[in-house]
């Protein structure tokens, strides 16, 4: 393309999930409810884990960090998507687009590694119970969380380095509700085949390696429990089945979109909903409703803050502050 006749793209047009006005209103209500559930549900987990001393253990420490990542992951694009359902101009600036690419890879990569850390915690608890306290110390948990952020940051910066210096001087329409890296890359004013290869290698190493580690750890846990007791095996499988389902819903779309980006499909933007919205909704449900300790702690927190006497005291404080 002749640079003299080209113009630099300053913004991108996001086509969103659909163009139907009736569906736009439905999607606005639906995703508004889901986003509210994500924020409140994960904040409740963080509050419960930090305030209840009985939950100050490695498993719940990692769960609290997962809830924080889920809130961040749902917030990088969902609020704008919800606002765009009621907007006639669904655009995003170039810097805003780069920011979305940065945050989606940072939080998604962080969650992948964090899920492996949580699986490792369960592996040590079940397969090496006598050494659990020694292995899963507070320092170890902190290091695992730091590693998850470090790995995701390296992954993100390497992905961003492929995109930020690309020349965008022509088409600026992204058929998605956020700036999806494979789609944005194809809008560049040059042959992006080599860059797509680098994206595949980068994303493939992270997603496939973490997914393989997760599956391997689950298999080892199930085999270990099965060798001890068939009844315990059934209980462990019922617990892990829901975790595995969430892992598949999270990793499946990521692997399909980012490890196979050469053919862009309209289905991709709907698959992206799974790891940006549905997984952050399901994680609090899976890790709370199927855990007796968490349910008891959540019930205690809710009763403490929502009991009638507490509410009347709070309303009295509010009224007093206005006088």
UniProtKB/Swiss-Prot annotation:
Predominant subcellular localization, coarse grouping: membrane
Ranges annotated as spanning the membrane: 26-49, 58-79, 101-120, 140-158, 196-219, 236-258, 270-289
Topological domain ranges for the Extracellular compartment: 1-25, 80-100, 159-195, 259-269
Protein keywords: Cell membrane, Disulfide bond, G-protein coupled receptor, Glycoprotein, Membrane, Olfaction, Receptor, Sensory transduction, Transducer, Transmembrane, Transmembrane helix
UniProt keyword Transmembrane helix present: yes
Disulfide cysteine pairs (residue numbers): 97-189
GO cellular component, one term: plasma membrane
Membrane topology: Multi-pass membrane protein
Cytoplasmic side: 50-57, 121-139, 220-235, 290-323
Single annotated GO MF: olfactory receptor activity
Cellular localization per UniProt: Cell membrane
Sites carrying sugar chains: 5
Summary of the function given for this chain in its UniProt record: Odorant receptor.
Protein name (record): Olfactory receptor 4K5
Source organism of this protein record: Homo sapiens
């Amino acid at each position: 393309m002749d640079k003299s006749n080209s113009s630099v793209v300053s913004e991108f047009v996001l086509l969103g999930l659909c163009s139907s006005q009736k569906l736009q209103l439905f999607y606005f209500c639906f995703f508004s409810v889901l986003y509210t559930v994500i924020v409140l549900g994960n904040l409740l987990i963080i509050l419960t884990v930090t305030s209840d001393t009985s939950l100050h253990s490695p498993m719940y420490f990692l769960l609290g960090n997962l809830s924080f990542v889920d809130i961040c992951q749902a917030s990088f694009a969902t609020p704008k998507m919800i606002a765009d359902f009621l907007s006639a101009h669904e655009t995003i600036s170039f810097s805003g687009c780069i920011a979305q690419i940065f945050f989606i890879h940072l939080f998604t990569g962080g969650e992948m590694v964090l899920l492996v850390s949580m699986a490792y915690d369960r592996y040590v608890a079940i397969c090496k119970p006598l050494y659990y306290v020694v292995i899963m110390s507070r320092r170890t948990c902190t290091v695992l969380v730091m590693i998850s952020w470090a790995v995701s940051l390296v992954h993100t910066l390497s992905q961003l380095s492929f995109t930020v210096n690309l020349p965008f001087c022509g088409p600026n329409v992204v058929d998605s509700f956020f700036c999806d890296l494979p789609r944005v890359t194809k809008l560049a004013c040059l042959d992006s085949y080599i860059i797509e290869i680098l994206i595949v290698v980068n994303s493939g190493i992270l997603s496939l390696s973490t997914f393989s580690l997760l599956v391997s750890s689950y298999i080892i846990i199930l085999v270990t429990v099965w060798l001890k007791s068939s009844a315990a095996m059934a209980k462990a499988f019922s617990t892990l089945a829901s975790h595995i389902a969430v892992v598949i819903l999270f990793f499946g779309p990521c692997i399909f979109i980012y490890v196979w980006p050469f053919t862009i499909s309209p289905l991709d933007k709907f698959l992206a909903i799974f790891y940006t919205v549905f997984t952050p909704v399901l994680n609090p449900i899976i890790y709370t409703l199927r855990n007796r300790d968490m349910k008891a702690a959540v019930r205690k927190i809710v009763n403490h803050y929502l009991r009638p006497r507490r509410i009347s005291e709070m309303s009295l404080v509010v009224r007093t502050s206005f006088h």
